[in-house]
């Protein structure tokens, strides 16, 4: 486990160094936010089974840069992995790993950006034949994300997505309207030292809204990062009818950008 974390952190450092030096295709680059944070639930007991760590690793590999001679019009393959680690529990198991590979097209629009893509997201558990059947979850969807970046540092993003998901041993739309949602709405701010973002995802499940919010303060090469999460946005195995996941508050480090 320690070896795995060492390799992951080393690779992240290499990606960050490459970004600073302006490496070109086909080098890996950071894609979505990368962080390592730890914390506790804000509801229910705090103990070795509920406290733990969360980390996210996300990279993109350019496949075709400056398509049609237009700078910034790039096609890439991306991969994001989010892990929930019950470090303090017996044997320190990973409670959930969410894997999200995809193909993405980035379209520059002056200060703004348009991102189109096809993404698969799953927790990697088999669909049939084992005791994990009841917790196998996956979604496949197209998405359209528009980000508006203002001179003041304000950032507004809308992400619309539609597809099909695997739930209760069948492909269904239920995972979208009940747990995953069809749209994400983000309000953020960035400056030389600060980054802030809050994302709301309307759903029709018990929570009514998945919320993910974070604040980062740059300190040297990294940023001190605090994150609040509420709803079904973290663990796909929490997608259970009638189940109410706990809200979490976590603190740690952010590598790169939050927005």
Which residues fall in each region the model found?
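N-terminal intrinsically disordered, low-complexity regulatory domains
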Residues: 41-46, 86
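Outer-membrane beta-barrel "beta-signal"
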Residues: 244-259
């Amino acid at each position: 486990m320690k070896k795995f974390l060492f390799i992951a952190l080393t690779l992240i450092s290499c990606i960050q160094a490459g970004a600073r030096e302006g490496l070109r295709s086909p080098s890996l680059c950071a894609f979505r936010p990368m962080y390592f944070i730890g914390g506790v639930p804000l509801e229910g007991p705090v103990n070795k089974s509920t406290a733990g760590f969360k980390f996210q690793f996300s990279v993109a590999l350019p496949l075709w840069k400056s398509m049609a001679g237009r700078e910034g019009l790039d096609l890439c393959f991306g991969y994001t992995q989010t892990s929930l680690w019950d470090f303090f529990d017996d044997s320190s198991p990973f409670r959930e790993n969410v894997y999200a590979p995809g193909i993405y097209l980035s379209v520059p629009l002056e200060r703004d950006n348009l991102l189109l893509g096809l993404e698969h997201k799953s927790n990697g558990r088999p669909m049939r034949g084992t005791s994990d059947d009841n917790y196998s979850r996956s979604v496949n969807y197209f998405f359209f994300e528009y980000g508006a970046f203002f001179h003041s540092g304000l950032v507004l993003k809308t992400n619309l997505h539609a597809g099909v998901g695997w739930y209760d041993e069948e492909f269904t739309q239920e995972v979208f309207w009940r747990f995953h949602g069809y749209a994400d709405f983000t309000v953020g701010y960035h400056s030389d030292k600060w980054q802030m973002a809050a994302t709301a995802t309307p759903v029709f499940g018990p929570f009514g809204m998945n919320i993910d919010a974070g604040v980062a303060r740059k300190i040297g090469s990294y940023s001190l990062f605090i994150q609040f999460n509420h709803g079904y946005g973290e663990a796909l195995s929490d997608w259970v009818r009638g189940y109410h996941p706990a809200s979490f508050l976590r603190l740690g480090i952010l590598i790169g950008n939050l927005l």
